[in-house]
């Protein structure tokens, strides 16, 4: 590698909106803020909601199924 052309790789804190602080390394050089992390994201916390799309499909077919009939 060439000398003096690479950015500094320093340790920073990534702070989530829930208050969780994650220590990581980056070339940004300053602390960053996150919207979601593994502590508050619904997928990781088990609070994920499954949407019932079957009702939407049936409703669509009911409304527009007449146009597809021959």
Curated annotation (Swiss-Prot):
Pfam families: Ribosomal_L31 (PF01197). Coiled coil: none annotated. The lineage of its organism: Bacteria, Pseudomonadati, Pseudomonadota, Gammaproteobacteria, Pseudomonadales. Binds the 23S rRNA. PROSITE patterns: RIBOSOMAL_L31. It comes from the Bacteria. One of its GO terms (biological process) is translation. One of its GO terms (molecular function) is rRNA binding. It comes from Ectopseudomonas mendocina (strain ymp). Part of the 50S ribosomal subunit. The gene is rpmE. This is Large ribosomal subunit protein bL31. Belongs to the bacterial ribosomal protein bL31 family. Type A subfamily. The keyword Manganese does not apply. Binds 1 zinc ion per subunit. Keywords: Metal-binding, Ribonucleoprotein, Ribosomal protein, RNA-binding, rRNA-binding, Zinc. Disulfide bonds: none annotated. Zn(2+) binds at residues 16, 18, 37, 40. The keyword RNA-binding applies.
């Amino acid at each position: 590698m060439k000398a003096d052309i690479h950015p500094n790789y320093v340790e920073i804190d990534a702070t989530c909106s829930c208050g969780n602080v994650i220590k990581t390394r980056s070339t940004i050089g300053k602390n960053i803020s996150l919207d979601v992390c593994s502590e508050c994201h619904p997928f990781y916390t088990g609070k994920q909601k499954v949407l019932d799309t079957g009702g939407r499909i049936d409703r669509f077919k009911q409304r527009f199924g007449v146009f597809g009939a021959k």
